[in-house]
Amino acid sequence: MKYSIHKRGEIAMKNILKIMLMMITIFTIAGSAVYAAEIPVSDQDQLITSRDWTEISNLQDEMKKEEPDATIDYDKALKVYVDCNLIKLQTADTKKLTSALESANYVWVIPFKMEKTYGMFTVAKGLPLREEAKSVLTKAEQEEVKNHAGKWMITETAEHTVEPYYDILLEKREALSDCTRVVLVGSQPGMRQPVALGMDDETARIWISLGYQYPVMEKIPETQNVESGVYSFESVAEISDTYIEDSE
């Protein structure tokens, strides 16, 4: 009889522990959802909710080989659109800007944490071998390019970087409160490093610094800033024309 009571007690305790674990999981998931909802990053611009996640997750062993002591934060991995000069379009229309982005190339920036610093993996899809490249590449190099075409690969590993872009955006969530989408773009005239663009359903509203130095932003008086590191789309557009020719 004592044994039976003891067993029932064990079962009851296990059930309690299961319930507690379930509650912790539910609150963690709910907390993550609220955390993600605080900034308007679309599912297609977050790695773990994108169509690229399955393939890129297979690179984890390679990442750990390059940075064995790193804690990789896939939850904060974001898409950066490249080869898309939004400034040259000379428009603030959200539909026109997003249409240009949809046809642009992009990379994924995956942050990681070391003991005392941050780092980033840049993951890009291999491009087809171009005819003009054949004259400057060896046969072996040409074969390597062909083998990587269409496949995701780590193209850069950087240490001692700025904090994760996601964290920077989270710090600027009040400035993004009127925006319905924020995207990261690179190689803009006067803003070569990645920068964030906040848009509402109708128009582009703000540019947000991601911790780099941008010649365009350095020319804007502090009195015209929305807040530190946040600039109106118009104020950047007014002086960015001088950088368009240099970017071509």
Description of each model-found segment:
Residues M20-A30:
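Bacterial N-terminal signal peptides
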Residues M1-A12:
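Short, Lys/Arg-enriched N-terminal segments with co-localized hydrophobic residues
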Residues G119-P189, T203-S247:
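A short, surface-exposed interaction/processing loop segment used at functional sites
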Residues A70-L127, S187, R192-E202:
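Exposed beta-strand-loop-beta-strand "reactive/processing" segments of non-cytosolic proteins
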Residues A30-P40:
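Sec-dependent signal peptide cleavage junction
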Residues I11-L21:
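Bacterial N-terminal signal peptides that target proteins for export
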Residues E38-D93:
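Terminal domain-start segments
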